[in-house]
Amino acid sequence: AALVQKALEEKLGFALALTRGEGRKGDVILEQCPQMGKEDYILTVDAENVRITGGEAGVWYGCQTLQQMVEQCGAVLPVVKIEDGPDIPNRGFYHDVTRGRVPKLSFLKKMADRMAYYKMNQLQLYIEHTFLFRDFSEIWRDDTPLTAEEIMELDQYCLERGIELVPSLSCFGHLYKVLSSKGYSHLCELEGADQMPFSLRGRMHHHTINVTDPESLEFIKGKIREFMPLFTSRQFNICADETFDLGKGKSRAAA
């Protein structure tokens, strides 16, 4: 309610007081209905008040619709009844924070605000090396990585806006920055990974981890152990895609 109060104040120029109990004439009334779907809501505007009734997340989504109405109509809203709910349960955005500039926490929060406004409910940040792994400093030391504290703060920020922040960590293919480093190049499927000239195509098509080396699994598990506890999500995206070199080098005999 406080988040909605602040958003409406920015659009209307005056603050609506928060309280609990029975609604009165002129109030914006928010009420949960356990019988409704979790993300469903009904928004009604009549001569008496504005009422948003919905499931646990539905009330929040109804508030986003109310904000959009205020942007269009100002303080004088039309009489209306809106019944709404999603057809798609997971409405997410996948954002690459590895190839290119690493965004600041303030930017990621603005992204979460915009996602909430459009009733999106899942955010994944694609990471190869742009997290400050305490045990693997060699892979991020030339960058400005996201920290554990920033991830936890963003996770809480997303939760408050109905967004699940899902960890997404590259664990198999195109580990360019990792497998071109001196300390970990021996884990690459192809020989001489640290000597390959940089190219965008090469970055995507090579630098697959060698699955036949037991050290590879321990390295990946170590990254996951450090990264996973920072999130409240029960999901984890290991990004095991685009392993173009698999079976073409050190693992050829096992392929």
Role assignments for model-derived ranges:
Residues 1-91:
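Contiguous, structured surface segment used for ligand recognition
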Residues 89-255:
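Substrate-binding cleft of carbohydrate-active enzyme catalytic domains
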